[in-house]
Amino acid sequence: MISIKRLSSADTEFDKALSELLAFENTQDAKLEAAVADILAKIRTEGDKALLEYTLRFDRVDAKSAADLELPRNRLQQALHNLPGEQRNALEQAAERVRVYHEKQLTQSWSYVEPDGTHLGQKITPLDRAGLYVPGGKAAYPSSVLMNAIPAKVAGVGELVMVTPTPQGEVNDLVLAAAAICEVDRVFTIGGAQAVGALAYGTPTVPRVDKIVGPGNAYVATAKRHVFGVVGIDMLAGPSEILIICDGKTNPDWIAMDMFSQAEHDELAQAILLSPDLHFIETVAASIVRQLETMPRKEIIRTSLENRSALIQVHDLEEACEIANSIAPEHLELSVEQPEKWVEKIRHAGAIFLGRHTSEALGDYCAGPNHVLPTSRTARFSSPLGVYDFQKRSSIIQVSGQGSAKLGAIASILAQGEGLQAHAMSAEYRYTKKIALGKN
């Protein structure tokens, strides 16, 4: 059997119970923090030498030189060529859908000219180099390659460098095939905090990047947090989440399996169902019990559902949307009639899946939108990974002679009000000196 929390929004203690359910303290392990700091410091000072030492210690790969840790491009093509046709076709179709979607996100530089000839605008520039971390070994995450590499390529990033560990020399061909499809420029068989450090600081072999993206274990996540500021990072991700709003008319087995799809990630993942239909909630609960025993990862699912998940009865769909906005979930399914109507009421969610046939898993792999999403209620102020994460914006200001006089006078007054005399004089010189010299 399995015991999942049952809550009702009508209970006087509901807000407290919901807050306790959502609470996730991403505690920092002092030993882990110290270990990561030591690894990063050694990579920064010793470069390739430290990288080889850590690769031998953690991955048990005895490379003779750091250059041996880089895979040749033909190795990626070989992995793609050796894939079974069905797998290759699925990867290529998913990649194309992700590419088409992200091309819609491209923004262009823009400018305008004021009547006095002053030119103002914004220049869009892709990053010079980005780093992509991909878990390796038996854990195959080709979808992570697609979701992180394709937006970078669409943005026009100059060079994309991928790192992926190969424990005991075990190379994951699915990951390499995905890298080939995405035209990743360089691939290094390194992982852990040492790989993050190499990307952030650079070594004689591994080039320094401007931004690091991609998922990883606690060491990788901690290392990304440590190097943030030296380089950019995508986000600090918490456990996976799904919130399902259902009117009670969807097949309960579908809803139960959608909850499983997040719960199987890890024991801290969260799956919540909101429905005004109590009978439907009970039917979903029964489906969970019935289907759980068929799941290969049933113990992980069980722990997640028992400790961090809930079945919640709400007054109506209006209230369900209000609660959803409070939760700001990573994934939100609107399994209801007229989902287009209800999505207008949603303000905070990483990705919103509309209708009964739109399972969250489709978004994870091949629908097109990115699956790198804000977690832990950060969808209140954060967005999915996208092309814009690999672009920078620079302001363009070209003031005409006539504009200099007008703006200089304004700037001078404001600068003097702030007690910054040099600012004021810098603004004034552009037009007072012209007047004195009789120039236009």
Curated annotation (Swiss-Prot):
The keyword Calcium does not apply. Substrate binds at residues 240, 262, 265, 331, 364, 418, 423. One of its GO terms (biological process) is L-histidine biosynthetic process. Pathway: Amino-acid biosynthesis; L-histidine biosynthesis; L-histidine from 5-phospho-alpha-D-ribose 1-diphosphate: step 9/9. Zn(2+) binds at residues 262, 265, 364, 423. GO terms for molecular function: histidinol dehydrogenase activity; NAD binding; zinc ion binding. Binds 1 zinc ion per subunit. Pfam families: Histidinol_dh (PF00815). Gene3D superfamilies: 1.20.5.1300, Nitrogenase molybdenum iron protein domain. The keyword Methyltransferase does not apply. NAD(+) binds at residues 133, 194, 217. Its cofactor is Zn(2+). It catalyses: L-histidinol + 2 NAD(+) + H2O = L-histidine + 2 NADH + 3 H(+). Its EC number is 1.1.1.23. It is an enzyme of class 1 (oxidoreductase). Keywords: Amino-acid biosynthesis, Histidine biosynthesis, Metal-binding, NAD, Oxidoreductase, Zinc. GO terms for cellular component: cytosol. CDD domains: Histidinol_dh. The active site is at 330 (proton acceptor), 331 (proton acceptor). Catalyzes the sequential NAD-dependent oxidations of L-histidinol to L-histidinaldehyde and then to L-histidine. Belongs to the histidinol dehydrogenase family. This is Histidinol dehydrogenase. The gene is hisD.
